[in-house]
Every structure is written in C-alpha cells, then in structure tokens.
Amino acid sequence: MNCYLILTVALLLTSAMTGTTTAGQLNKKGVTLREDDGFPCNAGNCACLPLDSYSYTCQSPTSSTANCEGNECVSEADW
C-alpha cells in the first residue's frame, strides 16, 4: 500500500516540476500560446487574452486593451 502512495506522490511531483504550461509553449512575451503555436488572428489584427478567459480574441490594434491580460494585444510580429 505504501508503495502505491510513494509512486503517486513521485509522479505528481515529477509532473509539477517539469515547468510545462497547460497550453504548451510560451511566446517571447510570456503569453501562453495555443497548441499549434500559430497566430490565431487575421493579418492586421492582434490577439487579446481576456482576463476572464483562456481563449484569445482578435481585435483591431487600435481597440482598448483594458480587458486583455497584461493590458496588451499581441501582434502577429510579436507572436
């Protein structure tokens, strides 16, 4: 019984210490990307990660970024 407990704890610690994010990789600004790492918006738009969501929304670069994480909308060049 104790072996199963030790094995479970070891697996959980290994998983926690790998430093991976749930969505995969990070871009150069530290924003969590989608699994495919492709820019999610059409050319000319920027990707905003809303404060209350895990999915990016696309918007015009001139739109307000008040609801975006880090108060920024990431352009395709910065993705």
Swiss-Prot record:
Any one GO molecular function term: toxin activity
Any one of the GO CC terms: extracellular region
Superkingdom of the source species: Eukaryota
Note on domains (UniProt): The cysteine framework is IX (C-C-C-C-C-C).
Disulfide-bond pairs as recorded: 41-58, 46-68, 48-73
Tissue: Expressed by the venom duct.
UniProt keyword annotations, A-Z: Disulfide bond, Ion channel impairing toxin, Neurotoxin, Secreted, Signal, Toxin
The protein's role, per its UniProt record: Probable neurotoxin with unknown target. Possibly targets ion channels.
Propeptide: 24-33
Signal peptide: 1-23
Name of this chain's protein: Conotoxin Cal9.2a
Entry annotated with the keyword Disulfide bond: yes
Localisation: Secreted
